[in-house]
């Protein structure tokens, strides 16, 4: 289920995935097969888990019917934009943008509940 908390963690998880992939490269380049006590296989398993999690969130966003809901979620949680910047880009007031965001979060959380 996708929650507001998972959306808020999206950018951090994406950065973490990049760091894990960098550690895998370093372990491969130095030939040791390990890095910071983790084997390449352990890093790859963690990276696959993070990548799957991020993909699930993006799929849920893409399944929303409203283009405004999809856009506001991407701008806020994937691109990390603030409400003012989103409002300017979407040509809405900040108040309307907050309403759209709140409704989009509600819709994505509801979609996750019906998937169970």
Predicted regions and their residues:
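Helix-turn-helix DNA-binding module
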Residues: 79-95
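Short, well-structured alpha-helical interface segments that form or flank functional binding sites
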Residues: 5, 81, 99
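Short, conserved sequence motifs enriched in acidic/basic residues, glycine, and aromatics
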Residues: 63-64, 91
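N-terminal interaction/assembly modules
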Residues: 1-63, 84-85, 106-116
């Amino acid at each position: 289920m996708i929650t507001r908390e998972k959306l808020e963690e999206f950018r951090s998880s994406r950065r973490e995935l990049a760091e894990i992939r960098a550690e895998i490269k370093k372990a491969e380049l130095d030939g040791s097969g390990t890095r910071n006590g983790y084997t390449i296989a352990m890093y790859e398993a963690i990276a696959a888990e993070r990548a799957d999690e991020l993909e699930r969130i993006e799929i849920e966003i893409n399944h929303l019917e409203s283009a405004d809901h999809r856009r506001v979620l991407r701008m806020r949680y994937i691109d990390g934009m603030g409400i003012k910047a989103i409002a300017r880009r979407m040509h809405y007031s900040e108040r309307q943008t907050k309403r759209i965001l709140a409704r989009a979060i509600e819709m994505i959380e509801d979609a996750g509940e019906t998937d169970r």
